Amino acid sequence: MRESVHTNTSIWSKGMMSVIAAQFLSAFGDNALLFATLALLKAQFYPDWSQPILQMVFVGAYILFAPFVGQVADSFAKGRVMMFANGLKLLGAASICFGFNPFVGYTLVGIGAAAYSPAKYGILGELTTGDKLVKANGLMEASTIAAILLGSVAGGVLADWHVIAALVACALAYAGAVVANLFIPKLAAARPGQSWHLRKMVRSFFCACISLWRNGETRFSLVGTSLFWGAGVTLRFLLVLWVPVALGITDNATPTYLNAMVAIGIVVGAGAAAKLVTLETVARCMPAGILIGVVVLIFSLQHALLPAYALLTLIGVLGGFFVVPLNALLQERGKKSVGAGNAIAVQNLGENSAMLLMLGLYSLAVLVGIPVVAIGIGFGGLFALAIAALWIWQRRQM
C-alpha cells in the first residue's frame, strides 16, 4: 500500500478513485453472492423461510462485532482495514464454492463486511471535507448502487446457467477488491493508541452510542438510515417471493432485474441529493422517505412487469435522495465527536439491528402463511408512517 501523509480534498483524487474502485468490486461480490447463494439454497431444497435467515446471519455479524470494528477502523490505516476485510469476504465466498455450509460461509462474509463498512465510509472524511463530503458520499453510493445493479443481475443470470460459476465470479470480485485496496494511500490512523481491552472497548463503543444519541442531528440520522436500510434489505427478499406470485415468473434472474431497477433509481437520487441538499438543508430529504413507503404499497398491487420496473425505479430515486444526506450528516458530526470509524460502527449497529428485526418479522410472516402481497402492503404503509413520525419528531426537537 502506498505511503501518503497528505489528504487531497478533491473528490476525483487518485486515492478517492482507488476507494471507489475497491468499493465497487466488494459490493459487486456482496450482491452477486447473495443471489448466487439464494439459488444454491433453492437448488438444495431449503424452505422459503430460510432465505431471510441467510441475510440474518450476515447482519448478525455486524451487530456482534459493532463494539470493535469502529476502533479497528480508527486505529489503523483505513485502506489496510478494507484490504483485510475483503480478504475475509474472499475466504467466505471460497468456502461456499468448495461445498462448505452456505450459512457458515456467508457469516464469514458478514464478518468481513462488518469490518469493512466503518473503514470505507470513514476514509471519505479523511480524503475530503465539508460539502464535498456530500458529493463524495454521492459518488460512493453511485458506485455501490452500480455494483448492486451489475452484481445482482450477474448473480441471478449466472446462477440460472451454473450456480458454482456464479459463486466463483463472486470470489474473483473479492480478489479484485483486495488488489484495488493496494492503491489506496496509507493515511495516518485517526485515533491511534486506544486500549484493546475488550471490556474497555465495549464501554467505549456504548459511550459513543450515547454521545451520538444525545445529539439531535446524529440521532435523527441514525434513526433515518436504520429505517431505510432495514426496509431496503427486506424489500429484496420480498421480491424473491413476490415475482412468482404476482408475475408468474419462477427464474432466478427476474428478481435481480427488479432489484437492478431500484439500484438505477438510487444512482439518480444520490446524484440529485448531492446537488440539491447540503448539511444545513438535510430535512429536504424527508418527503422522499415518506413517499418510499407509499410507492412500495402501490407496487405490491401490480401484476405486470412494466409498471413494476417503473415503480421500483421510482423507489430507488426516492431512496437515494433520502439516505445520502443522512449519511453525510452523520459522518461530518460524528467525526468531530467520536471519530468517523466509531460513528459508522454505531450507524451499522442501528441499521443492522433494524434489518434483523424487519427480516425476522418478514420470515415469521412467511412462515405463518401471510400472502406476500399483503406483506408488501403492510410493509409499505408502516414504513411511510415511521418516516412521517421521524420527521415530526425531528421538527419538534428543533
Curated annotation (Swiss-Prot):
The entry's keywords: Cell inner membrane, Cell membrane, Lipid transport, Membrane, Transmembrane, Transmembrane helix, Transport
GO cellular component, one term: plasma membrane
Transmembrane segments: 19-39, 53-73, 91-111, 139-159, 164-184, 227-247, 257-277, 281-301, 304-324, 350-370, 372-392
Major location (coarse): membrane
Topological category with respect to the lipid bilayer: Multi-pass membrane protein
InterPro entries: LysoPLipid__transptr_LplT, MFS, MFS_trans_sf
Tree of life domain: Bacteria
Localization annotation: Cell inner membrane
Listed GO MF terms: lysophospholipid:sodium symporter activity
Cited function: Catalyzes the facilitated diffusion of 2-acyl-glycero-3-phosphoethanolamine (2-acyl-GPE) into the cell.
Similarity section: Belongs to the major facilitator superfamily. LplT (TC 2.A.1.42) family.
Protein name: Lysophospholipid transporter LplT
Lineage: Bacteria, Pseudomonadati, Pseudomonadota, Gammaproteobacteria, Enterobacterales
Name of the gene: lplT
